[in-house]
Amino acid sequence: MTRSSGPLLVAWAPFSPTLVEVGALVGGRVVFLNILFGKKLAAPLRYALLALRTLSLLGKERPRVVLAQNPAIFLPLLLVLAKPFYKFRLVVDHHAVLSMKTLRQPFLSQGIAVLEAFVAKRADANMSPNNNWTRELRARGATDAFTYHDFIPQPTITKGQSQIGKWSPFPLPAHHFLVIAAHGGHPQELLEEEVAAIRGLDGYLLVITGKREKLGHRMDRMNPPSNVIYPGYLDDAHYESLKRNADVALSLSIELNTVPHAIHEYLAFGIPTIVLKDPLLRSLFDGAIVEIQDTRPETVGQALTRITQDSTVRNQLRENIQLNYEQRLKMHNEEVSKLKQVLVS
């Protein structure tokens, strides 16, 4: 059987923006395998069916190189075991080192750590989305561990070319400043603190976006004030228009070793972004972000008013954002070269 020429990129998930981006860069085929996703009680059946579909895919595609996303750890584990039979090079995209995110469940954490180390040592290469995770992989004995950061190119349409009505299909409360916050639904994303900060601020409108199945129950419990809007998940066109009209963004989270994808989006649009003080974020974005020490409403409110009402602060942020973008663009180009070397050469 003839082998496919391009790499095969696989995730046991409904979608992965990283895999789509990488697939486009290297001319690979991206496959998302999704059965009973999010149904914890059905996990054993789910993983068994996914394993069978993955083996069937390998037999059909006969790839020379496979990029597999972790988590779920069972996908790269299966591929490590299948490698000798199907004769492909395996690169694992570690979206996170999950054993460190499950430390509150020590037995689960230890079990995952054993599997992570086994996979990382036997894969031909290992990539992660930030340097902290890359160091953790190397500490586990990972082969050829490297970092591939998220990167969002600057848009070609400027803020002034878009009207706010294009993203909002309903009348908006009167406001002077539009604040946005996109969330994926992780429990350590600080939605409640963001809403509390806006609750007492006149003239500010906060728009929180994200899937209703992930955020809806939390938003309902908060009974948000009239200057907080939750439209759910916006399609690409409406979300892009929202970003073009935003004055400030909030990205408050205490999730371990995580760089929210939304920060890359905000900074690509030149939106001043407020984050909780974090060495990892500072190492990547430096002066392009606004760091705060805590998430008390008065602290967040002071940062918002300083950005929106002090032109000197805004101008300096604008310069910092552009300089940081140029630095990250150079780094991105270098990382793309490494990625192509690993997946195509």
Where does each model-flagged region fall?
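Conserved acidic donor-binding segment of nucleotide-sugar-dependent glycosyltransferases
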Residues: 288-298, 306-311
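Donor nucleotide-sugar binding/catalytic pocket of nucleotide-sugar-dependent glycosyltransferases
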Residues: 17, 21, 34, 113-160
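Conserved donor-binding/catalytic core segment of Leloir-type glycosyltransferases
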Residues: 161-163, 171-189, 195-201
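Nucleotide-sugar donor phosphate/pyrophosphate-binding loop at the beta->alpha transition
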Residues: 45-49, 89, 98-118, 187-188
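Membrane-proximal helix-turn-helix segments that form the acceptor-binding/catalytic region
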Residues: 55, 81-85, 92, 107-126
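Nucleotide-sugar-dependent
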Residues: 186-189, 237, 241, 249-268, ...
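A charged, aromatic-enriched C-terminal amphipathic alpha-helix characteristic of glycosyltransferases
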Residues: 309-343
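Nucleotide-activated donor-binding/catalytic signature segment of Leloir-type glycosyltransferases, i.e.
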Residues: 216-241
